[in-house]
Structure formats: C-alpha cells, structure tokens
Amino acid sequence: MRTGTTARSIAVTGAALLAITACGGSDDEGSTDAGADSGEKQVNVYGTDGNMGNALGEDFSEEGALAGMKGTTPLTDLSDDFKNRLLEIDPDLQDYNYAGETYDAVILTALAAQAAGSTEANVFKEYVNGLTFGGDTCTDFASCKEILDAGGNVDYDGASGPLSFADPGEPAEASFGLLQFGDDNTLDDELTSFVIAGDEDNAATDEGPAPAPAGATGDPLVIGTLLPLTGNLAFLGPPEVAGAALAVQDINAAGGVLGQPVQLIEGDSGDASTDTATQTVDRLLQSGVDAIVGAASSGVSLTVIDAITQAGVMQISPANTSDQFTTYNDNNLYFRTAPPDTLQARALADLIIEDGNNTVGILALNDPYGTGLAENTVQNLMDAGLSEDAIQSITYDPQAANFDSEVQEMVDFNPDAIVVIGFEESSRIIEGLNQNGIGPQR
C-alpha cells in the first residue's frame, strides 16, 4: 500500500525555519495551498497519529470531506514482504499504523529474555536498551538469536527501523510518515513521504550485561497484549494485533525463547472512559504473564502502569507517546517502541511551517496524549519563528455532547492552519469545521 513514497530527514531549524516562514503567505492570503484559483482562503487541516487512519474517512459520506488533510504518525516505509505477512495474519487490514512498532515490542521482549537466560522481567529488563544499539546489526529474531547464542552483542534494527533506545527505554530518533487524504476520504499512498526526527547520538551508551550462556529454561516466556479491540482507538487494534501475532509466529519458528515456544495471551485495552484495561491487566497478571505489550493510549497506560510494574512485569507499548513516561517511576520496567511526543511535535511543526502557514489553531484532546503533543507543537512552532499570538491552542472534552464552542473559537481566530489532535471524536470536530467553511473539504 505504501507505494510511490519519498524519504527525507528533518534537519530544519532556526534560521532555515524562519526563511520558510518568510516565504509563506500573509495572514489575509493564508498558506500557499489555500484557494489560489478562487482567491478565497482555504484553511489547511492537519491530524496526528490518533486520527490519521482510513477509519477516519469511514465517518464521511460526502466526497472530498477530508481532501488535502495532512498529518503525521510514527511510521516507516514498511517492506512489501512485511505487509504481505501481516495480511496473511489479517487479510482485512486497512492500514499498518503501529504494526511495526508492535512487532518490534514483542521481538525485543523475546530477545531480552534470551539474552538474560531468564523469563523473569526483573532480570531481562536490564538487557532491553542494549539490544538496540552498539552490537552486530540484525533485523529478525532468528539472526539476532544466533548472535546472542554465540556470546555476541545485538543491535536490533526492526520492522519500525533502527530503535536506538535512550536511557528511559524509548527511541532516541524515529521515522514519521507524512500522510494526506485524497478526494475519496482515504489516505493517498502516492503522497506519503517519510521524515526522521530526533538524534541517534542521544541513545544510551550502556549496552547492559553480557549475554548469559545459551541454554534452556523450564518456564516459557508468556506475553500478554493490552491493545485496543474496542473504544476510541479501536481502529489501531487490527494492525497492532497482527504485528504481535506475526512476531510470536516468527519467534517460535526460530525455536522460541530459551528452548520453549513463546505463549501469547491477547487482551483488550478499551479506552480511558472504561475500566476495560484494568480488568484485562488483572486477568493477564493472574495468568502469569512476564510482559505486557500495550496499551496504545497513553491515558490508558497511565491507569495500569503501576499495577503492571509493581507486579514485577515488564510493560512495553508500541504506541504510547506522552512525555510523562520519559520520567515515570516505573522500576525500569516500562519501555516503548513508539517515540515520545517531543519527536512527533517536531515533525508536525516542520510540516505546518513548510506549508507556509503563518497562524495556527490547535484543537487537542484533554488527556496526557493530547495536551502533551499540543504543548510540544506550540513550542516547536514558536521556535520556528511564529509569535505566541499567532497560535491558539484549545483543549476539549472528548465526551462532550458537541464541539460547537471550540469550532466557533477557530472560526473567530481564522487561522491559516488547524491541527486536530484527537481520536474517533475527530470526525465530529472536522464535520463542524467543514460546516463553518474552515475544514479540509474542497
């Protein structure tokens, strides 16, 4: 599906960003994309990983309702082979958001246990960061396992790209997809490009303990999943579930971990408005899992991280991006293969600036993900040269009956660009923007 793509690296800072801003239109003219033929201002609308998926388009029946809407999501240029193998797991996949990150979360967990010679999370947690840099490069479990069994050090470059974990157990740099909706309200894969944000030099330097001697254990590695099968992030569930299942399939095809097949116990995270995640975590812990992959939602993870890590179980999320996890007191048992919002905010702000927008409105979900990404985006826009009064950031309650007041504030502000940072409720917000002539609808 990701065909006709291009790749580039984010290195636009300081004066370069100021130069791009200076090339944009005036406040009256809007951005360079805006209504050039009619002379009318076309507001540019942007999304992020919480809504930039084909599931968003399913809420719109009118052609062109999302046409031209752009956005960012952690994404690498996945190989056709990897995507085809995911489709063998789930032939109905619509997109691949966080499939690579989920696959890598499972592989890293298995490699850490293999390296430690133990399925005890408090033992193998010390190996996780060191598996992502500094050693011999490998790209799948089988080849990495061969290196470990020979006493070597591993640098796992996975499906989501080189991970290069920093000390908090998160990527120091990451690939982001720049996505755009077409007239049919689906993502136009021909317009997808990729950028790199962050710096691999910020990766940790401690490669951790030496691998334990190769051997077997009587206890199989048991991995639970806490992924969104229901709730406002359910559209992310299928690719994440497929990524986890494919990883376990590959691990067991290579002989499993410490001579035993890995066991996978699946579970639903729901969303932050329910206690589904708490119930699932209780069930997984009672089942004796050694690690839990999930949740996707930062808000959901914050409700269960203490229960998981205080039980001596590792949590590794493929999609948490809130900055709160970088400094969270997690007994060194929390990791993530998704990059923190500081990196996505940089990619998003660069995209907005490169499109020539001089004024920016932000509508952000009032939760750790939404407020964190909004704050970081505002800072990056200001670092790029926009003044504080050229940016208006509003938070909203996703459970609200309507978003009329928030939309009206955007109408009154009349910015060149509007960023919607949300989940499934984003469609209702965008519908309101369209009805008021400031949405993506062409």
Question: What is each of the regions a protein language model found here?
Answer:
Residues 2-9, 14, 24-442:
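Extracytosolic ligand-binding ectodomains
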Residues 19-22:
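C-terminal motif of bacterial Sec signal peptides marking the signal peptidase cleavage site
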